[in-house]
Amino acid sequence: MSKLDHPDHAIAQLADLFHLLGDPTRLRIVLACLNQPTSVGDIAAALALSSSLVSHHLRLLRAARILKAERQGKQVFYSAADAHISTLLATMFEHIAEPLTAMDAA
């Protein structure tokens, strides 16, 4: 299988992942969880969102295996599901930071 020859189900999964990350609120939530496990309340406070809205987005992000949850006592803390998520986002931020060249503009 070449790098460009992927099964349809894998393409659909990847499209769904990018669709989820295409929502600015969800992307901010993911970014808030990258450096350390973070609780719903801390995410809500940091992003000035309601806890119920954050919880809704967290359910979607967990279902897509973008974030994982770990219970510690009565609180649940969220973090990146694996290193791929951090790497993907870091790479995309590097990509958008690259200067536009004359060749790109054509």
What are these regions (language model features)?
Residues 60-61, 79, 99:
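Alpha-helical and His/Cys-centered functional microenvironments
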Residues 1-13, 84-106:
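Amphipathic alpha-helical dimerization/coiled-coil segments
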Residues 30, 63-64:
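Extended rod-forming repeat segments used as scaffolds/tethers
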Residues 45, 56, 62-63:
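Alpha-helical residues within the helix-turn-helix
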Residues 37-38, 62, 93:
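Residue-level detector of secondary-structure transition/capping positions
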Residues 55-56, 94:
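Intrinsically disordered, low-complexity cationic segments
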Residues 9-52, 72, 76-84:
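N-terminal helix-turn-helix DNA-binding core of bacterial DNA-binding proteins
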